[in-house]
Amino acid sequence: MQAALTAFFVLLFSLLSLLGIAANGFIVLVLGREWLRYGRLLPLDMILISLGASRFCLQLVGTVHNFYYSAQKVEYSGGLGRQFFHLHWHFLNSATFWFCSWLSVLFCVKIANITHSTFLWLKWRFPGWVPWLLLGSVLISFIITLLFFWVNYPVYQEFLIRKFSGNMTYKWNTRIETYYFPSLKLVIWSIPFSVFLVSIMLLINSLRRHTQRMQHNGHSLQDPSTQAHTRALKSLISFLILYALSFLSLIIDAAKFISMQNDFYWPWQIAVYLCISVHPFILIFSNLKLRSVFSQLLLLARGFWVA
């Protein structure tokens, strides 16, 4: 029974990974083609293609890592393979968190109806900052990854050359992984998460008040404008839930509560990668350009299937 349940979660994780890789790859291909055609991208498209690329790579790295260690039965407490994976995983996770934050800020300054002078100034200036913010996010993520490697490398170097006894190696790994890294990661990931949370809550509150004002002025729930605002609210709330779930999952994952030998490992991996697999579809269906290309592909696939 346990083996069948594990197989079910492995299959579900595989399906989720394939969908995430396909959706993020689709976003990158569509916007990349437009970039090559016109030589430039709008600020929103810059963030979307950056977010799609980082999520595509993150999902790919995570999937390969999970199945490699599952198949090889490699001990998860150390080794060069783990170092190689964590370097890429930390970099891509950090970049993805920052890109999501800038996406929420851009949505906020473009859509939210706030009349404060600082917000109006930010509304005018922020789109021009987007390329530099994306580049800065990549540099920050790279520096953070190097710091993690610099702190972690001496311990694993000692582990590899077997200078520590087995008990000492275990104590070092447990102490660093369980007590030091989670707090450090919490501090680092809390910065983009706070930016995301503030901007998304401002936007949700602004849309909610605007929708209530429209209903108070006699607009029915079936009014196209009211429905558009309602859909936007639902999309933002789902983004908030998925992002918060991803943040909490990564913090708990950093604490190493669930190892690869644990029965709940595969369900937990589904929770960790849920946001980067599901949210791309929300972006596709809420973006006119992406939705149009996606609909054309569905029509082509349907015509091919019927033929």
Swiss-Prot record:
- The residue ranges for the Cytoplasmic side of the membrane come to 29-40, 110-129, 205-234, 286-307
Chief place of localization: membrane
Its GO CC terms are:
membrane; plasma membrane
What is the membrane topology noted in the UniProt record heading this document?
Multi-pass membrane protein
> A single GO BP annotation from the record?
sensory perception of taste
Q: Which UniProt keywords apply?
A: G-protein coupled receptor, Glycoprotein, Membrane, Receptor, Sensory transduction, Taste, Transducer, Transmembrane, Transmembrane helix
* Segments passing through the bilayer: 8-28, 41-61, 89-109, 130-150, 184-204, 235-255, 265-285
Subcellular location as annotated: Membrane
Q: Which residues are glycosylated?
A: 167
Could you tell me which Pfam families the record lists for this protein? TAS2R (PF05296)
Q: Does the keyword Heme apply?
A: no
Q: Which residues lie on this side of the membrane: Extracellular?
A: 1-7, 62-88, 151-183, 256-264
Hey, what tissues is this thing expressed in? Expressed in subsets of taste receptor cells of the tongue and exclusively in gustducin-positive cells.
Q: Which GO terms describe its molecular function?
A: G protein-coupled receptor activity
Instruction: Indicate the family of this protein.
Output: Belongs to the G-protein coupled receptor T2R family.
Supply any other comment: Most taste cells may be activated by a limited number of bitter compounds; individual taste cells can discriminate among bitter stimuli.
What does the UniProt record say this protein does?
Answer: Receptor that may play a role in the perception of bitterness and is gustducin-linked. May play a role in sensing the chemical composition of the gastrointestinal content. The activity of this receptor may stimulate alpha gustducin, mediate PLC-beta-2 activation and lead to the gating of TRPM5.
Could you identify this protein by its name?
A: Taste receptor type 2 member 41
Q: Which organism is it from?
A: Homo sapiens
Organismal lineage: Eukaryota, Metazoa, Chordata, Craniata, Vertebrata
- Gene name on record? TAS2R41
